[in-house]
Amino acid sequence: MAHSVKIYDTCIGCTQCVRACPTDVLEMIPWDGCKASQIASAPRTEDCVGCKRCESACPTDFLSVRVYLGPETTRSMGLAY
């Protein structure tokens, strides 16, 4: 089942989320906005199983990577009533 995976600009390019993902949903891409010159990207969200290991691995105070499961997606994006 595919889940929505969002990468935020608080990403520090550490690769922890990429290494934690058991289904290779995430990858690093070049980005000049951080010291590491790379940022996480989620090109294969259809393979996301919703384990949230990427969230657990993220060392930033505000999670740079978030996985939204089903109804959680619309609620967090302000689309649910």
UniProtKB/Swiss-Prot annotation:
<keyword id="KW-0677">Repeat</keyword>
<keyword id="KW-0004">4Fe-4S</keyword>
<feature type="binding site">
    <location>
        <position position="48"/>
    </location>
    <ligand>
        <name>[4Fe-4S] cluster 2</name>
    </ligand>
</feature>
<feature type="binding site">
    <location>
        <position position="58"/>
    </location>
    <ligand>
        <name>[4Fe-4S] cluster 1</name>
    </ligand>
</feature>
<keyword id="KW-0472">Membrane</keyword>
<comment type="subunit">
    <text>The eukaryotic PSI reaction center is composed of at least 11 subunits.</text>
</comment>
<dbReference type="GO" id="GO:0009535">
    <property type="term" value="C:chloroplast thylakoid membrane"/>
</dbReference>
<keyword id="KW-0602">Photosynthesis</keyword>
<dbReference type="Pfam" id="PF14697">
    <property type="entry name" value="Fer4_21"/>
</dbReference>
<dbReference type="InterPro" id="IPR017896">
    <property type="entry name" value="4Fe4S_Fe-S-bd"/>
</dbReference>
<keyword id="KW-0934">Plastid</keyword>
<feature type="binding site">
    <location>
        <position position="14"/>
    </location>
    <ligand>
        <name>[4Fe-4S] cluster 1</name>
    </ligand>
</feature>
<feature type="domain" description="4Fe-4S ferredoxin-type 1">
    <location>
        <begin position="2"/>
        <end position="31"/>
    </location>
</feature>
<feature type="domain" description="4Fe-4S ferredoxin-type 2">
    <location>
        <begin position="39"/>
        <end position="68"/>
    </location>
</feature>
<feature type="binding site">
    <location>
        <position position="17"/>
    </location>
    <ligand>
        <name>[4Fe-4S] cluster 1</name>
    </ligand>
</feature>
<dbReference type="InterPro" id="IPR050157">
    <property type="entry name" value="PSI_iron-sulfur_center"/>
</dbReference>
<feature type="binding site">
    <location>
        <position position="51"/>
    </location>
    <ligand>
        <name>[4Fe-4S] cluster 2</name>
    </ligand>
</feature>
<keyword id="KW-0479">Metal-binding</keyword>
<keyword id="KW-0793">Thylakoid</keyword>
<dbReference type="GO" id="GO:0009773">
    <property type="term" value="P:photosynthetic electron transport in photosystem I"/>
</dbReference>
<feature type="binding site">
    <location>
        <position position="11"/>
    </location>
    <ligand>
        <name>[4Fe-4S] cluster 1</name>
    </ligand>
</feature>
<protein>
    <recommendedName>
        <fullName>Photosystem I iron-sulfur center</fullName>
        <ecNumber>1.97.1.12</ecNumber>
    </recommendedName>
</protein>
<dbReference type="GO" id="GO:0051539">
    <property type="term" value="F:4 iron, 4 sulfur cluster binding"/>
</dbReference>
<keyword id="KW-0560">Oxidoreductase</keyword>
<keyword id="KW-0411">Iron-sulfur</keyword>
<keyword id="KW-0150">Chloroplast</keyword>
<dbReference type="GO" id="GO:0046872">
    <property type="term" value="F:metal ion binding"/>
</dbReference>
<feature type="binding site">
    <location>
        <position position="21"/>
    </location>
    <ligand>
        <name>[4Fe-4S] cluster 2</name>
    </ligand>
</feature>
<dbReference type="InterPro" id="IPR017491">
    <property type="entry name" value="PSI_PsaC"/>
</dbReference>
<dbReference type="GO" id="GO:0009055">
    <property type="term" value="F:electron transfer activity"/>
</dbReference>
<feature type="binding site">
    <location>
        <position position="54"/>
    </location>
    <ligand>
        <name>[4Fe-4S] cluster 2</name>
    </ligand>
</feature>
<comment type="function">
    <text>Apoprotein for the two 4Fe-4S centers FA and FB of photosystem I (PSI); essential for photochemical activity. FB is the terminal electron acceptor of PSI, donating electrons to ferredoxin. The C-terminus interacts with PsaA/B/D and helps assemble the protein into the PSI complex. Required for binding of PsaD and PsaE to PSI. PSI is a plastocyanin-ferredoxin oxidoreductase, converting photonic excitation into a charge separation, which transfers an electron from the donor P700 chlorophyll pair to the spectroscopically characterized acceptors A0, A1, FX, FA and FB in turn.</text>
</comment>
<dbReference type="InterPro" id="IPR017900">
    <property type="entry name" value="4Fe4S_Fe_S_CS"/>
</dbReference>
<keyword id="KW-0249">Electron transport</keyword>
<keyword id="KW-0408">Iron</keyword>
<keyword id="KW-0813">Transport</keyword>
<dbReference type="GO" id="GO:0009522">
    <property type="term" value="C:photosystem I"/>
</dbReference>
<keyword id="KW-0603">Photosystem I</keyword>
<dbReference type="GO" id="GO:0016491">
    <property type="term" value="F:oxidoreductase activity"/>
</dbReference>
